[in-house]
């Protein structure tokens, strides 16, 4: 049942859900439905609207009636269309990742006792150690 969702990124799952709902949705509803933080829902909506050209959306801004919070608005979003090209692009990316993983040679680990002080610090500060 879940196999179809494993390869899809969160933004696409959210967009598909919004399109199936066929109504205006706010970030709070997304955070509740997908059990994610509100800020992550807001950031995902922003990503869908600004970066993903294959997803067509309509946007409405409704001002909050809260006093003392400045000019904050609620953003209502409705997904109109999801282009089929996005699925082809994702399939190609997943295939490339699989091919890349298989061809990547395994680099033997160097014991820490063989590294000098500078090399140890360099290793600790490298991006690969922060993952």
UniProtKB/Swiss-Prot annotation:
A GO molecular-function annotation: DNA-binding transcription factor activity
Key word Transcription present: yes
One of the protein's GO biological processes: regulation of DNA-templated transcription
Assigned keywords, A-Z: Activator, Transcription, Transcription regulation
Origin: domain of life: Bacteria
Described function: Potential transcriptional activator of carnitine metabolism.
Protein name per Swiss-Prot or TrEMBL: Transcriptional activatory protein CaiF
Organism whose genome encodes this protein: Escherichia coli (strain K12)
